Amino acid sequence: MNRKDIKRKSHQECSGKAGGHGRPRQARRHKTCPTPREISKVMASLNLGVLSESSCSVDELLEECIRCFDSAGSLHRGDHILKMVLTMHSWVLPSSDLAARLLTSYQKAAKDARELRQLQICYLVRYWLTHHPEVVHQEPQLEAIINRFWTTVAQEGNMAQRSLGDASNLLSPGGPGPPPLMSSPGLGKKRKVSLLFDHLETEELAQHLTYLEFRSFQAITPQDLRGYVLQGSVRGCPALEGSVGLSNSVSRWVQVMVLSRPGPAQRAQVLDKFIRVAQRLRQMQNFNTLMAVTGGLCHSAISRLKDSHVHLSPDSTKALLELTELLSSHNNYAYYRRTWASCTDFRLPVLGVHLKDLVSLYEAHPDRLPDGRLHLPKLNSLYLRLQELAALQRQHPPCSANEDLLHLLTLSLDLFYTEDEIYELSYAREPRCPKSLPLSPFKAPVVVEWAHGVTPKPDSATLGQHVEQLVESVFKNYDPEGHGSISLEDFEKLSANFPFACHGLHPPPRHGSGSFSREELTKYLLHASAICSKLGLAFLHAFQEVTFRKPTFCHSCNGFVSTGPLWGVTKRGYRCQDCGLCCHRHCRDQVRVECKKRPETKGDPGPPGAPGPATPLPPTGCGSEEGLSYTLSPHLESGCHLHHAWTQTESSHSSWEPEMVPCPAPVLPSKASSKSSV
């Protein structure tokens, strides 16, 4: 039997085994290059050297770190083990324990007169404090042990060892810093920088969202990642919590900006703009903000708007479906992972997916084996994942940002909305249809809000700072001559940029020229932000001026006031149409009681023969800036009057509001409600 017959026979035997009842042979990869992750994994295992086994003790690991340094302080044995230990040791033992072991080793070496080993330990401590200066402030005991170490060096070490403890040798390395800002235009320039949402180009909006995302991503530390993996929550990790809150805020901002438009065609224009923003984010490889924007567009409160989606072009619908498929959680985000593996240059990951990988790696194996030795491959795998994220933080973004536009976006994202409020707006725009409608083709990614509920309400100091920055930017661009005021037209367009514009938050009626000073604009923004961010939309009352025929007390004053009770022919006050709350004219801004809508009026349009509520006519300029000034309360389209949330009263006729259909006379309160108000 020659060689060919032998090969043929062996091939037939293998084929017979594979084709029979035995297990099929696994497919092999031939003539293909390994992935970068496979290469880094193999190189890391080679760098482990004598510790390439599955386990080692803490003392063995520490001894290997000491031997990395020579007499001149150079790393002659590589730095992989050293960096891995200094980064990952806090996952298995406190940093104070590691410092105490180093102090004990130094004292033992000094007793044995081993000056080289003493010098190596000093180099290790200096390297640790230089590359990880933040660890000293994280454990109270660590700083005391480090001080004891350098005190011991000053007493028992030579001149070379004592010089390493000098504060001038413990400088922390400078990081890449935040991405650069684009200088704002000077006052002498005639051209304004538009701070209007409709005037912002898709490229411009995507760049500024990427700037905010990268700045938030850069602030995340390894300690934040460790805290999340060990605790399973972002609580107690400020930078990580801020990054998650930013993503959730962007998602909800997209939803409310869509719902802020009154007509389906106008909402479709906002949808189309955000779809183009998402496409640009995909080109910039900013996948985290892409997840937030796409999640907002695919949210059920938005995807149910059938009348609005009808106005989208086929190209926009196709683009949204492609982005949704890219970020789908199917098969553990397989599509996104393939796309991410092929990306180069600047890129920002979906943070939730990569944190999920860290948790999976941590939970897969124990920290220590049954004999008490450390499970080294687990620490090394976690370290490699952390290094990938750290390398992304050292990137240089390809775009810059305008400070004024950042102030506009920052204040817009500060506003807080609950799921109930967003759904309330959605059903007000397009009420439920009794007929069965086909399901939406859009599938929202599961990880859109991967840390549910992490949308922190900004405190008053933060809101005040952001409002002050925005007002400064507004007057710099819209009052270049320095008159100290902006026109009513500019104010209308600016106020429509914010999501709270859809809740009827208008300023007091203007007289004369109608211009707004710096103080008035600041007061308006602070008041509107406080209502939306702290009190919530449920505190907005639909006040209407009425004449009380029976003695009635002001709910805000809590009794009679100097002008007497609210009754009589000339005693006029204000009553909320939804909950029946009464108050004086000058007290309607001080009402801090939640509007509890009566059950008989909630979602009930009334009998068929009843007169309908005031209904605003659609604006003539669909999608224009003037259309943005058309605002409504959450229940306008479902049967409630348009009202001001600034004064919490019905809107008065002014030049900057839509024309109103004449409203029928208000129905007098029933006898039961009158008795309850007495």
UniProtKB/Swiss-Prot annotation:
Tissue specificity statement from the Swiss-Prot or TrEMBL entry: Expressed by mast cells and their progenitors (at protein level).
Biased composition (Pro residues): 605-619
GO cellular component entries: cytoplasmic side of plasma membrane; cytosol; membrane; plasma membrane
Compositionally skewed regions (Basic residues) per UniProt: 1-10, 20-32
Key words, A-Z: Calcium, Cell membrane, Cytoplasm, Differentiation, Guanine-nucleotide releasing factor, Lipid-binding, Membrane, Metal-binding, Zinc, Zinc-finger
Ras-GEF domain mapped to chain residues: 201-432
Annotated region (Disordered), positions in chain: 1-33, 165-185, 598-620, 651-678
CDD domains listed in its UniProt record: RasGEF (cd00155), REM (cd06224)
N-terminal Ras-GEF domain: residues covered: 49-175
Compartments where located: Cytoplasm; Cell membrane
Predominant location category: cytoplasm
Zinc finger (Phorbol-ester/DAG-type): 540-595
Entry annotated with the keyword Lipid metabolism: no
Organism superkingdom: Eukaryota
GO molecular-function terms, A-Z: calcium ion binding; diacylglycerol binding; guanyl-nucleotide exchange factor activity; zinc ion binding
Transmembrane segments: none
Pfam families the UniProt entry points to: C1_1, RasGEF
GO BP terms in the entry: antibacterial innate immune response; cell differentiation; phospholipase C-activating G protein-coupled receptor signaling pathway; positive regulation of natural killer cell mediated immunity; Ras protein signal transduction
Domain EF-hand positions: 466-501
Database matches in SMART domains: C1, RasGEF
Domain remark from Swiss-Prot or TrEMBL: The phorbol-ester/DAG-type zinc finger mediates the binding and the functional activation by DAG.
Entry's family note: Belongs to the RASGRP family.
Protein task: Functions as a cation- and diacylglycerol (DAG)-regulated nucleotide exchange factor activating Ras through the exchange of bound GDP for GTP. In neutrophils, participates in a phospholipase C-activating N-formyl peptide-activated GPCR (G protein-coupled receptor) signaling pathway by promoting Ras-mediated activation of PIK3CG/PI3Kgamma to promote neutrophil functional responses.
Protein name: RAS guanyl-releasing protein 4
